[in-house]
Amino acid sequence: MYQDSFYILNSAFSLSEIEVGAHLYWEVAGLKLHGQVFIVSWLVIAALIGFALVGTKDLKQAPQGIQNFMEYVYEFLQDIAKNQIGEEEYRPWVPYIATVFLFIFGANWAGALIPWKLIQLPEGELAAPTNDINVTVALALLTSLSYFYAGLSKKGIGYFARYVQPTPILLPINILEDFTKPLSLSFRLFGNVLADELVVSVFALLVPILIPLPVMTLGLFASSVQALIFSTLSAAYIGEALEDHH
């Protein structure tokens, strides 16, 4: 009996161990990659693709079950793009906005719900890909490239006229804004996800039974909000690049 109790407590404490900065490195062409990030990212992507395949396997005129849920999700993501980019030009950008939202949402929830610490790695530990700054910076840079592409594809070289509007005095500030946008996107997402995981780990370490559950529930809500914020801001930046300045 005592051994069973000790085993349960020991398992709970092992789940709450805090390890920051340790990584499983894969060396590819002289580059060191964070292996645990790729593993969890691939699992999240596979889960999203699998869910999409199951949901579109037997499409019906009157949607039911998972098809009905998927159509609701699609309409929700479509509304994000439409509201931020505009009725006329939002459609080509729905796939990107939806992909960003679903990946961040899936990655955040995977990190919050799945007890990755039970899976032992030679180094580091599995966790939400979004608690790695490299992932959030990459996502933010994708958004930056997207709104540059949107502006240039519509306006050509004339897109750069926005840097001197409404007055050339604002040129340095407008240039600086292009650097602060990806910085704010990446650090906001990274900081919130990492802070949530650390708070849950600390609570689980101090009081491993039941007490962390409310914090985990709040973390799931915050994870969903972060996915919404990132995708909404991405759509807003693209919409800003597409709008006509007079």
Curated annotation (Swiss-Prot):
InterPro entries, sorted: ATP_syn_F0_a_bact/chloroplast, ATP_synth_F0_asu, ATP_synth_F0_asu_AS, F0_ATP_A_sf
Localization of this protein: Plastid, Chloroplast thylakoid membrane
Predominant localisation class: plastid
Pfam families to which the protein is assigned, alphabetical: ATP-synt_A (PF00119)
A Gene Ontology molecular function term of the record: proton-transporting ATP synthase activity, rotational mechanism
CDD domains tied to this protein: ATP-synt_Fo_a_6
Transmembrane segments: 35-55, 94-114, 133-153, 202-222
Keywords annotated in UniProt: ATP synthesis, CF(0), Chloroplast, Hydrogen ion transport, Ion transport, Membrane, Plastid, Thylakoid, Transmembrane, Transmembrane helix, Transport
Highest taxon in the source lineage: Eukaryota
Bilayer topology annotation: Multi-pass membrane protein
An annotated GO cellular component: proton-transporting ATP synthase complex
Gene3D superfamilies associated with the record: ATP synthase, F0 complex, subunit A (1.20.120.220)
Quaternary assembly: F-type ATPases have 2 components, CF(1) - the catalytic core - and CF(0) - the membrane proton channel. CF(1) has five subunits: alpha(3), beta(3), gamma(1), delta(1), epsilon(1). CF(0) has four main subunits: a, b, b' and c.
Function of the protein: Key component of the proton channel; it plays a direct role in the translocation of protons across the membrane.
Sequence similarity: Belongs to the ATPase A chain family.
Name of the molecule in the record: ATP synthase subunit a, chloroplastic
